């Protein structure tokens, strides 16, 4: 397959500079050291820049050279100020697109240019990959995202671009191009993996959007910067990706049944593809080398677009034809189509993740100027950071411990909630609960469950009635078969029904057991309804009349609350004459309850102030520690602090001592206040009126909890009942569908057995007629031989074996082939049964039974039972019938039936005609002609069956698992009319096949 051409960014070029002398000058001036000691380090940095200039644009090695130089610049920036006022080096870089030179003394400009080249190398490496190979495809996908990440880093960290290629809008356009190409590469992989059409459409839509964004950038913000071939290529890619998105979305719409919308999307895809083809043809054959595109880019794009356009047009013709002749759905206009959803699969990889999983230190190398600015300084700073972290952890633990002690003490005293009770706030405890109101509102307007239960009972009765009807039909058919076997003996070679209808009977029994199991669940639901029906009615009425508070108050009264009239006429646990504890006045000099409560509240306020102050102090301490930086101190004292780091750390940590002391003082103050609170509140609780009030509150609380628990149980029962009824409705709906499908299979089985029996009966009668003439011939031969023995005349000479003279003992020629019975032409022909070729060869001149071809596809191999040593029978085998045969002429006797007699032998079923012998097929469970496998009954647990090795998966009972179709009026009418056979049956009930005599 032709590979789509990709755009790669050109690299910036730079002039050679000298790092050595400026660095040596700065070392001499600022550090006071001999610069010659660092000659090797300066030369190493200078060589890194020279190597970076010659880095290959499409290899991982070039990327690593650029990144190594960039990493050393980052380390250098921590030690040497490279700018116009300190280390003055002119960095000259040429614009990647306009080739104009730009010179600056800023190290940031040097680093931005290096990152730009890293991005360009990544994009080149990605564009040159062979994406037909899985490794190449993954490499291209990763590198396009990494390139976008490096360009993003430029836009976020270098705000003032000195050149056009580093301009924010230019870089943003490059980001969109690389991300769009990464999205396209990911789409190619998903198309090769044959993912779902809807998923592919979203990926293509995102790619088209990114290419459109890139086009907008080239035309509005970066106009004239990029080569025209780039703009044309972006136009092709945008239109092509839009066509791909519409194409796959059309396929998805077609799969979902929206054929008219699919046609409209294919028309849109054709439009986009035609536009893309026009743009692709406009690509020039000779392209500038600076674009990194080859001369094959144009022809490759033309081939890709043409191939896709052919697919679109082919699918469009198919969809239009299907919609015109089958679906007849309206085709919306292009404006009426919804946009295809976008799914981003390519994201910019951050710089920090460029070498994820690799040893970055190995790529960057050791710090070149480690001797000048030792890394030990950094290590010492890390040790100091750990000391600060220890301090913060210790102070945080003190604050959390104090807060926990306060919370535990207040919770033990039930403060401040208990003060509200003592001040008369207990009336709130008898107000209706919001949750209770919500329960009543949810029950409001809900219909009674009785109607739903009646419907369930009706559905269950219908299911059981259908199952009973199926069982009766099978019993009737089996009885008829065995009566014919009793009448004709060994000549009646039709297989016993008991083995053929085993699957159907098992299904009937299984479904009936399932319904009986469901009846137990129905009984549980009914018991729940009887238990809580009155409560449901109360809550429903309260919700509809907005009197939930009345119901709640009544429930509280029943639970044992004290009584006193309220405005609603309902009793309340408080009486208006009781008054409040705050109204009590003591004359013996003891503080009143109100005064004691005020003292407790005052202490609580002080405790809250202490807690807030302590929390704020800890917050300030953390902020100060986070902003503390002693790097300069460590650098200035790097020679004097060797071995004395701990003393330096202690001196530096002293700046946090005031905050530590404030936390300690707050903890001491809290301890004193808690002691005072314990004494004051204890005295308050010892007051007789307070103790009585508290006892009353506890009683009301228990009553309230009891009421809420009761109605919570009622509410849960209501929800569970509703959920259970929905599950039951779903169960019986599925069960009805399953049983209707079973009924169709039973009808099909009965019809096939009737046809087979009628054909066998005709065969037996023809053989009897032929057998009568043969018997007369044998009697004449016996009489002639007897006369010869009694005769006194000499016997004539014997005839040699090879003589052509015909003797009396001439062997009989084989009987002529049995012809299909002829039926009167004056009878209106019913629907003809399907005609099938025999599948079992005829052996030893004996006609055998053949199964219709469609049966075998439902029979699992290896599951059959052989009835005769010399041949195998398929269960449910029916002899093929003539085209004009009416299978419904097989009557069903209306009289009661006796149990089928057991037969010790089985004979092959005669067949009226024979085609070509085929190998015998192992028999399996009988599957009637036209058998529609019913779905398994909706039970809580399904039995596990061994996997089928046949052409179709098998489910319970060996059925092929397919979706059963529901019942229809035709089948219902057929099942009701089938037992009515006509007067001939009632006239001769002893012979169930008597009705067939009228056909001759």
Swiss-Prot record:
Cysteines joined through disulfide linkages: none
Polar residues bias (residue ranges): 840-849, 981-991
Biased composition (Pro residues): 898-922, 931-954
Record's keyword terms, sorted: Coiled coil, Cytoplasm, Endosome, Protein transport, Transport
Domain of life from the UniProt record: Eukaryota
Domain BRO1: 5-406
PANTHER family noted in UniProt: PCD6 INTERACTING PROTEIN-RELATED (PTHR23030), TYROSINE-PROTEIN PHOSPHATASE NON-RECEPTOR TYPE 23 (PTHR23030:SF30)
Name the record gives this protein: Vacuolar protein-sorting protein bro1
Organism, as annotated: Emericella nidulans (strain FGSC A4 / ATCC 38163 / CBS 112.46 / NRRL 194 / M139) (Aspergillus nidulans)
């Amino acid at each position: 397959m032709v590979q789509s051409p990709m755009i790669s960014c050109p690299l910036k070029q730079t002039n050679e500079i000298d790092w050595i002398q400026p660095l040596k000058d700065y070392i001499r001036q600022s550090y006071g050291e001999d610069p010659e000691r660092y000659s090797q380090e300066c030369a190493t940095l200078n060589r890194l820049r020279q190597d970076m200039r010659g880095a290959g644009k499409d290899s991982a090695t070039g990327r690593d050279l650029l990144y190594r130089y960039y990493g050393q610049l980052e380390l250098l920036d921590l030690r040497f100020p490279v700018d116009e006022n300190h280390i003055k080096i002119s960095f000259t870089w040429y614009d990647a697109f306009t080739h104009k030179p730009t010179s600056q003394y800023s190290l940031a400009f040097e680093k931005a240019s290096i990152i730009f080249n890293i991005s360009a190398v990544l994009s080149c490496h990605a564009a040159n990959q062979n994406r037909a190979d899985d490794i190449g495809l993954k490499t291209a996908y990763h590198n396009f995202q990494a390139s976008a990440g490096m360009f993003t880093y430029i836009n976020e960290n270098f705000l003032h671009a000195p050149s056009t290629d580093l301009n924010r809008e230019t870089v943003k356009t490059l980001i969109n191009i690389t991300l769009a190409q990464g999205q396209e590469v990911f789409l190619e992989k998903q198309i090769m993996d044959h993912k779902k059409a809807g998923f592919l459409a979203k990926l293509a839509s995102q790619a088209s959007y990114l290419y459109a964004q890139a086009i907008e950038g080239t035309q509005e913000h970066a106009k004239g910067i990029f080569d025209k071939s780039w703009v044309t290529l972006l136009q092709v890619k945008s239109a092509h990706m839009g066509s791909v998105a519409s194409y796959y979305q059309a396929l998805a719409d077609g799969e979902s049944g929206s054929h008219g919308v699919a046609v409209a999307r294919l028309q849109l895809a054709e439009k986009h593809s035609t536009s893309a083809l026009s743009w692709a043809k406009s690509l020039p054959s000779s392209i500038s080398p600076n674009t990194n595109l080859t001369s094959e880019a144009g022809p490759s794009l033309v081939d890709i677009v043409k191939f896709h356009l052919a697919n679109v047009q082919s699918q469009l013709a198919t969809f239009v034809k299907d919609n015109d002749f089958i679906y007849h759905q309206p085709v919306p206009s292009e404006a009426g189509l919804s946009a295809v959803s976008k799914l981003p699969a390519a994201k910019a990889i951050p710089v920090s993740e460029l070498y994820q999983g690799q040893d970055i230190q190995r790529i960057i190398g050791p710090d070149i100027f480690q001797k000048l600015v030792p890394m030990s300084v950094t290590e010492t700073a890390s040790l100091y950071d750990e000391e600060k972290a220890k301090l913060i952890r210790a102070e945080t633990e003190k604050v959390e411990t104090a807060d926990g002690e306060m919370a535990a003490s207040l919770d033990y005293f039930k403060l401040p909630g208990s003060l509200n009770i003592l001040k008369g706030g207990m009336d709130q405890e008898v107000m209706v609960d919001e949750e209770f109101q919500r329960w009543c509102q949810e029950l409001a307007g809900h219909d009674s469950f009785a109607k739903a239960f009646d419907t369930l009972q009706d559905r269950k009765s219908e299911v059981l009635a259908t199952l009973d009807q199926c069982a009766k039909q099978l019993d009737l058919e089996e009885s008829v078969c065995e009566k014919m076997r009793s009448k004709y003996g060994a000549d009646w070679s039709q297989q016993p029904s008991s083995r053929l209808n085993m699957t159907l009977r098992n299904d009937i029994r299984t479904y009936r057991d399932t319904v009986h199991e469901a009846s137990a669940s129905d009984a549980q639901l009914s018991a729940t309804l009887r238990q809580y029906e009155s409560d449901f009615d109360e809550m429903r009425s309260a919700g509809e009349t907005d009197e939930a508070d009345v119901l709640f108050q009544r429930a509280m009264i029943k639970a044992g609350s004290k009584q006193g009239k309220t405005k609603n006429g309902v009793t309340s646990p408080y009486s208006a004459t009781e008054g409040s504890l705050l109204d009590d006045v003591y004359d013996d000099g003891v503080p009143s309850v109100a005064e004691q409560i005020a003292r407790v509240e005052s202490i609580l306020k002080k405790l809250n102030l202490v807690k807030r102050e302590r929390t704020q102090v800890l917050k300030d301490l953390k902020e100060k520690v986070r902003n503390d930086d002693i790097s300069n101190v460590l650098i200035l004292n790097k020679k004097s602090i060797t071995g004395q780091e701990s003393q330096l750390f202690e001196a530096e940590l002293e700046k946090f001592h005031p905050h530590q002391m404030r936390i300690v003082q707050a903890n001491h103050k809290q301890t004193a206040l808690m002691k005072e609170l314990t004494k004051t509140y204890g005295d308050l609780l010892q007051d007789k009126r307070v103790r009585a009030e508290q006892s009353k509150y506890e009683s009301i609380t228990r009553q309230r909890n009891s009421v809420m628990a009761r109605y919570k149980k009622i509410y849960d029962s209501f929800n569970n009942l509703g959920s259970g009824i929905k599950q039951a409705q779903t169960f019986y709906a599925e069960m009805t569908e399953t049983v209707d499908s079973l009924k169709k299979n039973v009808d099909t089985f009965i019809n096939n057995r009737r046809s087979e029996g009628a054909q066998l009966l005709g065969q037996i009668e023809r053989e009897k007629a032929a057998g009568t003439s043969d018997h007369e011939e044998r009697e004449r031969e016996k009489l002639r031989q007897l006369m010869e023995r009694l005769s006194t005349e000499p016997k004539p000479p014997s005839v040699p074996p090879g003589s052509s003279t015909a003797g009396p003992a001439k062997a009989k020629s084989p009987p002529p082939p049995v012809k299909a019975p002829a039926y009167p032409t004056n009878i209106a022909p019913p629907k003809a049964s399907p005609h099938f070729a025999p599948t079992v060869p005829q052996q030893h001149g004996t006609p055998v039974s053949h199964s219709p071809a469609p049966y075998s596809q439902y029979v699992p191999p290896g599951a059959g039972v052989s009835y005769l040593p010399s041949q195998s029978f398929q269960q449910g085998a029916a002899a093929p019938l003539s085209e004009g045969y009416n299978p419904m002429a097989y009557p069903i006797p209306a009289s009661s039936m006796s149990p089928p007699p057991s037969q010790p032998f089985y004979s092959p079923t005669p067949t009226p005609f024979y085609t070509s012998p085929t190998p015998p097929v192992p028999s399996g469970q009988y599957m009637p002609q036209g058998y529609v496998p019913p779905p398994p009954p909706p039970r809580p647990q399904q039995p596990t069956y061994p996997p089928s090795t046949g052409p179709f998966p098998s489910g319970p009972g060996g059925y092929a698992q397919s979706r059963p179709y529901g019942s229809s009026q035709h089948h219902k009418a057929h099942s009701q009319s089938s037992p009515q056979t006509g007067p001939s049956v009632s006239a001769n009930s002893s012979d169930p096949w008597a009705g067939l005599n009228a056909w001759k």
